[in-house]
From Swiss-Prot:
Residues 188-199 have a biased composition (Polar residues). This is Charged multivesicular body protein 5. Residues 186-215 are annotated as: Disordered. GO terms for cellular component: endosome membrane; multivesicular body. Probable peripherally associated component of the endosomal sorting required for transport complex III (ESCRT-III). Its main location: membrane.
Amino acid sequence: MKRFFGVSNNQPAPTLDEATKRIGGRMGQMDEKINGLNQELLAYDKQIKATRPGPAQNAIKQKAIRVLQQKKMYERQRDQMASTSFNMEQTKFATESMRDTITTVSAMKQGAKDMKTQLKHIKIEDVDDMQDEMQDLLDYNNEIQESLGRAYQTPDTLDESELEAELMSMGEELELEASMPSYLMTPSVPTTDPHQSSVDEYGLPIGQEASQQVV
């Protein structure tokens, strides 16, 4: 029955990678054959140069021509394979680029969808209000820091030159007082109570009448 109806081919189609590798392998085989033919041509060339013109040399030339024809055939086949491989590489690159583009577009669509969902929870007015509030708080904090860092200054009336002059005059007054006799000095303000009883030179209390007699 299989001979009449055949068998369905369920094998998967080769991929571009597989086809490219296969052609690359065949190109390698062609290169080996071409290199081998080049070695034969070199050998025939030496024989032709070493042989005198005549039937023997002509026979060697005929063999060399056949080898050269075979080499040309392999080179044409190799060039065709190289062109096919280049086209397949271009197709592979274009296919991969399209896949990358599809993946990128899909990811961007999902990203846009996620952004729309997240933006529903954010309002620009709320962001502006928050920024204004933060700026106000920072300004207020700066004012507090400036107030705390303010230096305490002496009144403007206390000039340094005036203080220096006062200090010099105080020194002169102190020197004058030190050199002046005690009886010429201005009496100091009494510190005792006038109604308090007086005492004599021995420390004994003096009566009021006695005090009047002394006066």
